[in-house]
């Protein structure tokens, strides 16, 4: 407490209510090839509908990772999903050579200032699906069908100087009179360019060309057609409220994103997004003081496109509102105000790409994940996940399935093939391997497909957590029933299960009347140990994670009897609770002078030894039936 130099009352407060907190144990993690969505970025997904909304529906080429993810989500948890793409994948663009923009961070670093030379727009994410997008924008010059579009010179005339002018008749409504400029060559009028399209015309305006000394020049005018998406908005874009206050005009635009080919919605021509009243001025604000600059609005809010370069006519777009009296208008003659995106390319991720995705899950301080699935990836990827995620974090389990060729249409050789797959993996208590693939219905492509079981095995751990606790075995008829499976590619017989289980592979078996069941709970640890069971490994993950989280609050306190007693009073009630919930048989916490010696204290360390007797799951049941003579006492038989 603070020293007081004169009489007074000092009020202070101490918080000694710390407890061991609950920790997450059901968060899944998977890296895969998806049809759409951000790449090389972790996205939390909590349902199959959410998975479709973010990563799109699967195709016949990339269904595997989607179906594995959806299989896991069916058990009621959420998953951290990472999409990866191959090096040749490209985002769709307006024009030029397509580029690869994996995610928001890469866009901001490489293309945030509009670089790219790909026209005004790029698809939000890599893939051919972006080729279905069309973007159209309109301002005062292109929105209505009452504006001036172009001139046709019917007579070039003669004797004109550079001072010649063209005068256009005013519109009937009096809204705004169009203006134009002349190009003179050899005294003749060679071109007439629209400088302002005007508005409110019901018929083509009359063009009067003056200052000729010879034959008079004449020209006819053509009105624009209506912007096809004008019905999506309530008003003609003119000048924003911010623009009026800043003293500029014609900064307002409307923009729509269209599903031109129906790849996103199933209906060609569907409007996916619309942005009303956005501004060409880089400093523009909306009514709630957020940026209303069209590039910022699109890049921050659109789910489908990035804004890259300005339109060709937008040479003054992006300037401050105070620097422009009137912003350039699009006009219907601008070729790039409505554009279909092209150049998007799908490329499946290579092994190195998938490994890079799993590496995002390796930092336990930034990412909380418990159940890492490897889908149908090769053993090199699965082993990488074990070595570089689970063995580094030591608070999650990697779930692996054998290769498809090992158990699908491999009659008679399944056991040897699956064991060969196992030989490529690190034998770790932080990993587990099942025996096969399931046959399930792919409703997105209307067909049945084989899918690896590792998503389901991770899902049975979720069931164990929800129905009981993480330290309960996920196997068996109570918690190990596989969902959404028509059949197994291979259901091992008893003799085959004996071989698999002895090697550390958990069989998944189809039992008539009982469904398809996970029939083993081993980890990949090769040596005899309590940690060669999933429930024991997950028990220690929970204990270590929860106690370590609570122990952080002892950092920078004094290593004295009070702190040690406080730590024991923190941990022991937690362990008694776990014991009451059948997770451990007994425990002891040692945190005193015996393990916090003077030398340990002088090294600024704090030590606690926590001894637990983990509960064991039943793997083998022996039932002995003994027949006796009628006159024999059971006590005589030792019963």
What are the residue ranges of the model-derived segments?
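Structured, hydrophobic secondary-structure cores that serve as assembly/anchoring elements
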Residues: 1-100, 106, 119-120, 124, ...
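Charged, amphipathic alpha-helical segments
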Residues: 6, 13, 93-105, 130-144, ...
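Surface-exposed or flexible loop/turn and strand-edge residues in extracellular/cell-surface modules
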Residues: 40, 116-118, 130, 148, ...
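A short, compositionally biased
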Residues: 114-117, 160-164, 202-204, 244-254
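Ser/Thr/Gly-rich low-complexity blocks that favor extended beta-strand/coil architectures
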Residues: 122, 126-144, 166-182, 209-219, ...
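Short, cationic low-complexity segments
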Residues: 143-144, 278-284, 629-639
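Conserved, function-critical positions that sit in or immediately flank catalytic
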Residues: 144-225
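Beta-strand-rich solenoidal segments
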Residues: 224-299
